[in-house]
């Protein structure tokens, strides 16, 4: 969707970093002990070794829980990560917020092997048999280095539902909230750089004490489209809310993002939790290393992890526990190749059965996204295709941490239930009854203002119009997905990609809601508030897409995932045969093994799961260490 900053800009950014301090100082920060002042002290050399805890996956949850276990004195901790530093393996692209749409398109070749696994789905019935690239972070930071950086929490009722599903009230809003706050280092908006008509509202009482490692803030740049969109949302009946961190979502707000408040670089679990943990003498990372299999003793206790570093095989032994944080696709995959999963699947691949858990890989839930687009009489990220504008934007970003490159494409997030009378007119009785099962505060649709062109989402960079116009879109995402997918294995070898079947848009309720959501996006562009800035009629898909059948057809062709895959190692009560982990994230049927990532969610809360993944990691770390 956006061009790469100029080579001079990229080199300038690197030169600034190099001149300021050696790499070790940059990563460790002030106050690091002399004994750990060399970067290599925190990175393991391949070979058989023993630790108290072995964490598989250096992603969003993995680095958070590993860092906390080391910090809280639980013992020695090793982290296994298949990738390396995204700052080195992806140029500036992963660090600059405005470049978050690189290598995330549906096309199977729109991926970058330095930071992405290159996974793709099996052909999707809900998308006319299309298989899609599904971006997943293969780097330190995992998908927190690949996501769109939105930081927002689910609703109070969604966490209450979680608590009820797993039989543990520690997941109810009031009890779970401290673990959200624990991660945060919140910085208020810089109004001087954000400009006019971009005032934010937030509740500081739910944003922690500022001692957490994870920087959350507002972008230093607000696209003009957002200020007009705010008026349009008000016209649609969506009131301004306080920052979406207090367990309430219905309404609109400028979004908070995981961005470094000083540099406007992406904040990930690597730049936050890992960099803090590098100073701990009981912490070690094995990067560029693939976990092949979890090993169990005769009592079904997880005792070690078999690894592969560029063909060299070795084992890390865990005295206390193995923590699996490989994500919604690879956590179930690794369980299955290790002998934990549906017995029939394991038998098919000749894998000795350790524990028959039929729920492993099932219950996959996800959010989809799509958008109509207009030409607008405003500066949007489309302007970055103009060389003069891009050069100035490059200077603004690298010299002042300002300008459009500091903006992660979306400014305002908004949520709603389809309002009456359109609800009765657009949705069938069956769909309305199904949606009535969700609590009153649980939204059905999310809106995201986007300063750019969306299109079919095959390849944002390649497909961005270069006709000199500025484009804006209103993306919509479904918050009540009822379609259920699954993850399975194609081989007993963890190096062979898993079989990913999100099963998007296979439930009729999802399909009806998807059509209604598209109509609401058109309502947005039809407001009187936006008339002064729209140029012509709807550009994409255009007025030829008019009937419900045509809208459904268009949605099926144009939607993509927003990369919220979850629930494939679902948490539940121990008596539930489909549950994979209990409320302490312990794998049912074996000992000394936990799953801590989005795969352990019992259900997908509305909105963006990043904050909940961090909170879950914080909570389970405290459960393990007992030192919180």
Swiss-Prot record:
Task: List all annotated glycosylation positions.
Answer: 48, 92, 197, 260, 386, 429, 486
Catalytic activity from the UniProt record: (E)-ascladiol + A = patulin + AH2
What enzyme class is recorded for this protein?
oxidoreductase
Keywords noted in UniProt: Cell wall, Cytoplasm, FAD, Flavoprotein, Glycoprotein, Oxidoreductase, Secreted, Signal, Vacuole
This enzyme's EC code(s)? 1.1.-.-
Q: Which family does it belong to?
A: Belongs to the GMC oxidoreductase family.
Annotated PANTHER family: DEHYDROGENASE PKFF-RELATED, GLUCOSE-METHANOL-CHOLINE GMC OXIDOREDUCTASE
Q: What is this protein called?
A: Patulin synthase
In its UniProt entry, the species of origin is given as Aspergillus clavatus (strain ATCC 1007 / CBS 513.65 / DSM 816 / NCTC 3887 / NRRL 1 / QM 1276 / 107)
> What's the name of its gene?
patE
